[in-house]
Amino acid sequence: MNPFPRAELDAAFANYQQVVDEIATSREWERFADLFTPDATYIEHAYGTFQGRAEIREWIVRTMTTFPGSSMVAFPPRWSVIDEERGWVVCEIRNIMADPGDRSVHEEPNITILRYAGEGLFASEEDVYNPMRYLPMVRDWAMVANAHGRLPSNAHRWMETYAPGWNG
């Protein structure tokens, strides 16, 4: 049985969402690690497992300041479920790219599992997604952005690697 009341879990997840929303605007990704306990674990299936705030901070800053993370502008949850018995929050997060110039929306979701530790902090986060869908979404976004003169300069090397035949 979870020792945390439902209201505390709700408040912690609301704070998580608010902080991520603020970070998406400010681009101060180093703040993200402060949502976790000092010994937290972050599992990201494509990038690996990160132990502790320092590793989480280093990874998130590096990931979100280089393409394609640097072109993601919003991460709202589509839905969420709170498992009171375990103290978990499970949600679907929309990873939304910036407007590529034609107002089209390019996004790919992931499932996030947050394990609550108390005092407003999470002990772990695990992100689960399908890279076979994520990569084509980013490629499609980049093609549209390039056609509208809005492809960031740091995206060219990524496109050369993940979009064979691209000659932007």
What is the predicted role of each segment?
Residues 53-54, 101-104, 133-141:
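A short, polar/proline- and glycine-enriched secondary-structure boundary/capping micro-motif
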Residues 126-168:
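Low-complexity, intrinsically disordered terminal/linker segments enriched in charged
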Residues 1-34, 38, 155-168:
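Short, low-complexity N-terminal intrinsically disordered segments enriched in polar/charged residues
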Residues 74-75, 105-112:
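Short, surface-exposed coil-to-beta transition loops
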Residues 80-87, 115-123:
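A short, structured loop/turn motif at beta-sheet edges
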Residues 65-70, 96-107:
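Short, cysteine-centered beta-strand-loop-beta hairpins and adjacent loop/turn segments enriched
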Residues 29-89:
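A solvent-exposed, acidic/Ser-Thr-rich amphipathic alpha-helical stretch
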Residues 13-20, 36, 60-64, 91-95, ...:
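Hydrophobic alpha-helical core bundles mediating ligand binding, dimerization, or RNAP-core interactions
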